[in-house]
């Protein structure tokens, strides 16, 4: 069945800067915002934008992500024609061919794309937090008669060297692209969101794949090649909320952003819902002794202590006399009686011991509490007690 536009969602990244949060799961599967996973935002954007055919390309630690996505029913993508399809690397006659870059991942799934004979292909990343109407971007792409359109956002000049940076003319046509430049000429950063005319994308994926010196990456190889060959690349300016949650600190910041009174993400906006898999937990319980303010408290939580400006995921327990401030407590974790937690991300199923304290040594830092961190902390406490 022919589709005007289909999406290819890149979800195979490890996210090593998130440290132990991605030891056993892919970055797009990391919990976020009390009840979601990072990939929920991109999948929900597709649903809300009317993109009903999505290929999800997975590779690193994919099992939980595959189980979570299932047949796509949580995002209304369980369709007979189209819907969501998980696309891990697979074995061919020459052996298993791992994805070797973002462009190579799409190249290896040309047959999947061809069955829909699309006019346009939307390439997405599954590891950013944002809301976007992709239909508006597609309309812009068509109006500009572009070969490729790249969504861009203005970033602070001091951070521009961390991104792929676009230089454009007055018509927003891209005249120069630099990947993480030491001296950026612009602060228009690529968001890793592309719309290509499918015939042209197919042609250049094949050219790139045949180049043994290519890293097979859209930003490093394919886009510069299009510029060299004088194609029509345009930048699509995006002005909403967008966060690259690639570090522990940025993940914590994005969760805290949700608690701002006028935050741009607004999880309660019924006109642009963020869908997720229902955890099937009982209602949360807030005891008479508890004090909760400026926080997100999800299903299945039991709160008997004090919670201030924090995000509690499903099944979290906060004991009597415990205090939690500016923290993210992930699914199934517990803060025991009398414990104190501030500016921390507590990983799933971790248990903070009674009357212990968790807070960063540097006031601007964030503590990532894991089983290994707790073990080391307990050993240090035991040594101090012995002394």
Curated annotation (Swiss-Prot):
Gene3D superfamilies: Hexapeptide repeat proteins, Spore Coat Polysaccharide Biosynthesis Protein SpsA, Chain A. Keywords: ATP-binding, Carbohydrate metabolism, Glycogen biosynthesis, Glycogen metabolism, Nucleotide-binding, Nucleotidyltransferase, Transferase. Its EC number is 2.7.7.27. GO terms for molecular function: ATP binding; glucose-1-phosphate adenylyltransferase activity. One of its GO terms (biological process) is glycogen biosynthetic process. It catalyses: alpha-D-glucose 1-phosphate + ATP + H(+) = ADP-alpha-D-glucose + diphosphate. NCBIfam families: glgC, PRK05293.1. Belongs to the bacterial/plant glucose-1-phosphate adenylyltransferase family. Pathway: Glycan biosynthesis; glycogen biosynthesis. It comes from the Bacteria. CDD domains: ADP_Glucose_PP, LbH_G1P_AT_C. Homotetramer. Involved in the biosynthesis of ADP-glucose, a building block required for the elongation reactions to produce glycogen. Catalyzes the reaction between ATP and alpha-D-glucose 1-phosphate (G1P) to produce pyrophosphate and ADP-Glc. Alpha-D-glucose 1-phosphate binds at residues 99, 164, 179-180, 190. It is an enzyme of class 2 (transferase). The keyword Transferase applies. PROSITE patterns: ADP_GLC_PYROPHOSPH_1, ADP_GLC_PYROPHOSPH_2, ADP_GLC_PYROPHOSPH_3. This is Glucose-1-phosphate adenylyltransferase. The keyword Glycosyltransferase does not apply.
